[in-house]
């Protein structure tokens, strides 16, 4: 190996390693408490989509990464989010929002009202047993006032929520130099989202990363990684092939995936024949007696197959972008055998699936008057006709009822 190839090889490995480290750092996932309704089972870091939309407006979790002084979409944003880096005071627009100031707090009014509230609170203890008079209006679900408990006249009335905030979690403010720790954020998340009077936006506090990995292949932007947006079911692990579609080693069928397409493809390929799973058609080994093998190697241009060719089939569904698939049979002049089913034959296949089926062999159609030359191993040996060399497409054979036409 020459000396010029060694640094390039090391650089590729370093880039791959840093990309994997960035992926592991840029996805914050917090485990939920076991037994909570609607949450993942214990030990699985999964958040539902609706929970994360409400958690985006939770105090301390609206730290958007595009406001980071470290740059847009950097891997150290999660360190800043977890409180391992100093808070961001360089941007004036980072501060408590309107819905974050709705919590009942007497801290701004305390210096002026302190000498006035103390005697009233002291006399309130003596007066309250004697007055059964008008009580303050009670909301449903609110406990009655205890002895010595008054409502400040300047305090805004807040509608009670179903889960009132516990006093153990302090109010998180970005103007405060003391940033919340990891345990406070995790405790806030395990407590659940806080209910606000004002309806929040559709995606209130989502931050964006520089790659697209959700199910619909969003235009290279996703927010909190949700298990409902992952390619699998709830709580299933993500594949590296969907996170890094440009790496050909992880998923061969994703090497020409467009990341900015508005619709993502369904990357599941259903093969009906169990033999073709082990023997891939891309290697030219389909099921025994398959129509792909029945084309005579000596006679490439089969008139029976060419008569079934749809005009403009290559410009339709099964288009080959690079036009250099070595597993396809070619004629003497270098042309491929054109036995492709037209795009209108299968209405279930969308144009996004054309990239997925490109590594599989073309669907070679047979004339309607001829049967398929398939080998049925369940039939008795005397019912099978001997296979003769030559063009085996036109030889009548026993039709296998269990073999369906592959997509």
From Swiss-Prot:
Residues 1-26 form the signal peptide. Its main location: secreted. Ameloblast-specific. The modification Phosphoserine is found at residue 48. The modification Hydroxyproline is found at residue 42. InterPro entries: Amelin. GO terms for biological process: biomineral tissue development; cell adhesion; extracellular matrix organization; odontogenesis of dentin-containing tooth; regulation of cell population proliferation. GO terms for cellular component: extracellular matrix; extracellular region. It is found in: Secreted, Extracellular space, Extracellular matrix. Residues 124-143, 259-304 are annotated as: Disordered. Keywords: Biomineralization, Extracellular matrix, Hydroxylation, Phosphoprotein, Secreted, Signal. It comes from the Eukaryota. GO terms for molecular function: extracellular matrix structural constituent conferring compression resistance; growth factor activity; structural constituent of tooth enamel. Belongs to the ameloblastin family. Involved in the mineralization and structural organization of enamel. This is Ameloblastin. It comes from Mus musculus.
């Amino acid at each position: 190996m020459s000396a010029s190839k060694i640094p390039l090889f090391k650089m590729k490995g370093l880039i791959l390693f840093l990309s994997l480290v960035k992926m592991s750092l840029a996805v914050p996932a917090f485990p939920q408490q076991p037994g909570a309704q609607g949450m993942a089972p214990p030990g699985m870091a999964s958040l539902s989509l609706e929970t994360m939309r409400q958690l985006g407006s939770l105090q301390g979790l609206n730290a958007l990464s595009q406001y980071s002084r470290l740059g847009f979409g950097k891997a150290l944003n999660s360190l800043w989010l977890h409180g391992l880096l100093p808070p961001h005071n360089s941007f004036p627009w980072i501060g408590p929002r309107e819905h974050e100031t709705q919590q009942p707090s007497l801290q701004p009014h305390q210096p002026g009202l302190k000498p006035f509230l103390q005697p009233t609170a002291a006399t309130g203890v003596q007066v309250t047993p004697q007055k059964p008079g008008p009580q303050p209006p009670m909301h449903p679900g609110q406990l009655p006032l205890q002895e010595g408990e008054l409502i400040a006249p300047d305090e805004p009335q807040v509608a009670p929520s179903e889960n009132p905030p516990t006093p153990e979690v302090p109010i998180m403010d970005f103007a405060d130099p003391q940033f919340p720790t990891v345990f406070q954020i995790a405790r806030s998340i395990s407590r659940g989202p806080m209910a606000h009077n004002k309806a929040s936006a559709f995606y209130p506090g989502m931050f964006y990363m520089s790659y697209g990995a959700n199910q619909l292949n969003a235009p290279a932007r996703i927010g909190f990684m949700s298990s409902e947006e992952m390619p699998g079911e709830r709580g299933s692990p993500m594949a590296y092939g969907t996170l890094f579609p440009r790496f050909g080693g992880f998923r061969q069928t994703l090497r020409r995936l467009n990341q900015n397409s508005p619709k993502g493809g369904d990357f599941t390929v259903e093969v009906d024949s169990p033999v073709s799973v082990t023997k891939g058609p891309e290697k030219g080994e389909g099921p025994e007696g398959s129509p792909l093998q029945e084309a005579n190697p000596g006679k490439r241009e089969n008139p029976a197959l060419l008569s079934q060719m749809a005009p403009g089939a290559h410009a339709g569904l099964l288009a080959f972008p690079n036009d250099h698939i070595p597993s396809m049979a070619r004629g003497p002049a270098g042309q491929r055998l054109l036995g492709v089913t037209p795009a209108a034959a299968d209405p279930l296949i969308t144009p996004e699936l054309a990239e997925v089926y490109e590594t599989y062999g073309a669907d070679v159609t047979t004339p309607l008057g001829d049967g398929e030359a398939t080998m049925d191993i369940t039939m008795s040996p005397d019912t099978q006709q001997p296979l003769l060399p030559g063009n085996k497409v036109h030889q009548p054979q026993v039709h296998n009822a269990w073999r369906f036409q592959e997509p």
